[in-house]
Design a protein with these regions (language model features):
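SAM-dependent nucleic-acid methyltransferase catalytic core
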Residues: 4, 136-300, 307-314
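Mobile active-site "lid"/loop adjacent to the S-adenosyl-L-methionine
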Residues: 306-352
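S-adenosyl-L-methionine
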Residues: 1-15, 19-20, 25-33, 48, ...
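A short, acidic, amphipathic alpha-helical segment used as a generic capping/interface helix at domain edges
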Residues: 345-363, 384
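Conserved proline-anchored active-site loop of SAM-dependent methyltransferases
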Residues: 16-29, 38-43, 204, 292-314, ...
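Conserved beta-strand signature within the Rossmann-like core of class I S-adenosyl-L-methionine
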Residues: 328, 366-372
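Conserved phosphoryl-transfer catalytic core
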Residues: 51-155, 161-164
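Class I S-adenosyl-L-methionine
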Residues: 376, 382-429
Length: 429
């Protein structure tokens, strides 16, 4: 329905911008028919868009090689991290090997104790004994050195910040070492900025597949829930299934996933229009820039956040991967303290934010195609949104209703039928 709505107002071979790109799914669906621009305030989305949406020549795609990524720089960083964290790495491997396929009992309980008491940045206290030999690296003083110079060798951000619950330590060592490798390749001139974004996008993909969290995002790290020794508890079968999933993810090899994504990308990448471009800006700054108007884009696709959820919390880890800045963190989820919250997510600001957005679209002579899911969590009712649309686009507003299922995280029922609206605002001179 979204593609059809965009097709209905956009001329053949015209151009479309997805102003809140997110996962870039919509932009990808348009790439064969239009010049596509995409924008997102989050840096991880921007990097993914640079890999998926921007044009790359056959020469660039053919020049991508795993030998570079897993070459000298990768080996150098991995060797140093493996030396520094040798004791917890060895203990973790033994725990995962000893568990086998038995997800309860004394052996699993030992792993749970390790999982629940892993040291992390600025919190070395009350850690499992396997961290004793390397505990100084987790001290606030050591972390501060990295905050002052994030390029310090060895790259250690994930190893220090996210080793349990989110990832296993061996996965963190891999993530840090791959990131070090592609940064050094860029710094030494062995790869271009364009290639660096593509290589980094594969690492974002890996994080999504191995993270230990509730739901399909990074907002809530998953805990290992208890089971009774005789498995007679009401939720024991569910908790066992979750334990199995956690162990399966912990055992996954990042390098293998990275290689698979690399091969898939090289085999399936289809170049779109050479003018395709990704932006990483607040939409107000982008739409107010005279250079934007000069692009003569026909249509804006708009799917901003409509609830009071902190969306930046959902993707704080890929954001930190891209920024690689050893951030200040807080709470059990180790969220960035500087995380961004859109005005669309704040009840007192949402309507005015929408009004600003539609005004800027109109000033740029853009058709606007808006997705809106009418769920219980939405801040703005559909009536308010359509009213603002009519304020700027008058009678040239079409509202369509499309039902779909959505995930209702942490609530019952878990899957809920929502009203999905597609609002088309047609610009007329």
């Amino acid at each position: 329905p979204i593609k059809i709505a965009i097709d209905n107002v956009t001329p053949q071979k015209g151009s479309v911008i997805d102003l809140f790109g997110g996962s870039n799914t919509v932009a990808q669906s348009l790439i064969n028919d239009y010049t596509v621009y995409t924008n997102d305030y989050q840096a991880y989305s921007y990097i993914a868009a640079k890999a998926l949406i921007e044009y790359h020549s056959t020469n660039v795609i053919n020049s991508l090689t795993l030998e570079k990524v897993f070459g000298k720089y990768y080996k150098e960083n991995k060797a140093e991290l493996t030396k520094r964290f040798s004791t917890p790495l060895a203990a973790e491997k033994k725990f995962l090997d000893d568990i086998g396929d038995l997800y309860y009992g004394p052996t699993f309980d030992k792993f749970t104790d390790y999982f629940d008491h892993s040291a992390y940045a600025g919190h070395p206290e009350n850690s499992h004994p396997v961290f004793n030999s390397c505990i100084s690296y987790y001290s606030s003083a050591e972390i501060q050195k990295y905050r002052e110079n994030s390029k310090l060798f060895p790259y250690s951000l994930f190893t220090l910040y996210y080793g349990n619950p989110y990832f296993s330590i061996h996965q963190c060592v891999e993530i840090d070492s791959i990131n070090y490798s592609i940064d050094k390749l860029l710094e030494s001139g062995e790869i271009t900025d364009e290639e660096h974004s593509i290589y980094l996008s594969f690492l974002i993909y890996c994080l999504n597949l191995i993270v230990i969290s509730v739901g399909d995002h990074f907002a809530q790290p998953q805990k290992i829930k208890p089971v009774k020794p005789d498995l007679s508890g009401e939720r024991d079968s569910i908790n066992l299934r979750e334990r199995k999933k956690i162990i399966g993810k912990k055992r996954t090899l990042v390098q293998q996933l990275y290689r698979e994504k690399f091969e898939e990308y090289k085999a399936n990448y289809k170049a779109g229009n050479i003018a395709n471009k990704a932006f990483n800006l607040d939409y107000k700054i982008l739409l107010s820039d005279p250079a934007f108007k000069a692009l003569n884009i026909n249509t804006a696709y708009i799917d901003p956040p409509y609830t009071n959820a902190h969306y930046s919390r959902f993707y704080h880890i890929p954001e930190t991967l891209v920024k690689y800045d050893y951030p200040e963190i807080e709470y059990f989820g180790r969220y960035r303290t500087d995380r961004y919250q859109s005005g669309f997510c704040i009840k007192s600001q949402a309507l005015e934010e929408f009004r600003t957005l539609l005004r800027l679209c109109k000033e740029n002579s853009l058709h606007a195609v808006i997705s809106y899911s009418d769920t219980a969590q939405c801040i703005l009712p559909i009536e308010d949104i359509t009213s603002v649309c009519q304020e700027y686009y008058h009678n040239n507003v079409l509202i369509e209703n499309v039902a779909h299922m959505y995930r209702n995280f942490g609530q019952k029922p878990n899957r809920v039928l929502a009203k999905e609206y597609i609002i088309t605002c047609k610009h007329k001179e």
